[in-house]
């Protein structure tokens, strides 16, 4: 059971699993073995849905402010940036949904960071040193969420479709797909050859082997 009310983004690290909570906007580091809380960091984000680590910083997708936060390793804010592709989502239950921003994030290196943005149905490749967009690829579903890179391919969760898609990051071509019928897939990361994903409503963090 996740310690917060609604886990929504994950990022693997050698010393623990980072999880951002959409309910209380706290960032937790969890022990890989028993899920115990190693760190509990409050943040200034709102309805956070994604997290990644890189360049000595924590990066968080603040979904309801449609911003990307650059934070210190203690969770305090360094800078906040506008989210590319922000807007209303296609899966909303209202005719005029509020403007929201990014979900999944994945740091690659000092010049490359992927950001999944459901309103745009795209994953943007950004330069974290300038926070400018380099290019983007389309998503196969309407609700892209967590993502990670492995052996040159992108693995992208889609919460609405209950699937994880393996994509060519050059153009978004679907190379394979994995059904995740229950309970739901939100944030996602890779550790020890396994996919780890979080389920917001049941407050679960789950893991399955990465398909061949």
Predicted regions and their residues:
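Conserved beta-strand positions in repeat-built beta-propeller and related beta-rich domains
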Residues: 19-24, 60-65, 115-120, 156-161, ...
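Beta-propeller domains
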Residues: 22-32
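A short beta-strand motif characteristic of beta-propeller blades
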Residues: 1, 36-41, 77-81, 86-95, ...
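Short loop/turn segments that connect beta-strands within beta-propeller blades
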Residues: 31-35, 72-76, 127-131, 168-172, ...
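Short coil/turn linkers that define WD40 beta-propeller blade boundaries
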Residues: 25, 35, 66, 75-76, ...
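Ankyrin-repeat and related helical/solenoid repeat scaffolds used for protein-protein interactions
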Residues: 148-196
């Amino acid at each position: 059971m996740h310690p917060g009310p609604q886990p929504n983004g994950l990022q693997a690290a050698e010393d623990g699993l980072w999880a951002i909570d959409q309910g209380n906007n706290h960032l937790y580091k969890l022990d890989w073995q028993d899920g115990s809380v190693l760190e509990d960091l409050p943040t200034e984000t709102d309805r956070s849905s994604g997290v990644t680590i890189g360049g000595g910083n924590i990066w968080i997708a603040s979904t309801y402010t449609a911003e990307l936060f650059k934070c210190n390793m203690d969770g305090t804010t360094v800078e906040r940036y506008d989210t590319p592709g922000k807007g209303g989502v296609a899966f909303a239950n209202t005719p005029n949904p509020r403007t929201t921003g990014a979900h999944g994030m994945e740091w690659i290196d000092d010049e490359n960071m992927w950001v999944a943005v459901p309103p745009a149905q795209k994953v943007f490749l950004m330069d974290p040193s300038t926070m400018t967009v380099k290019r983007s690829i389309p998503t196969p579903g309407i609700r892209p969420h967590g993502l990670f890179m492995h052996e040159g391919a992108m693995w992208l969760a889609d919460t609405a479709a209950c699937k994880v898609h393996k994509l060519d990051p050059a153009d978004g071509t679907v190379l394979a797909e994995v059904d995740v019928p229950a309970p739901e897939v939100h944030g996602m990361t890779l550790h020890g050859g396994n996919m780890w994903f979080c389920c917001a409503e049941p407050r679960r963090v789950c893991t399955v082997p990465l398909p061949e």
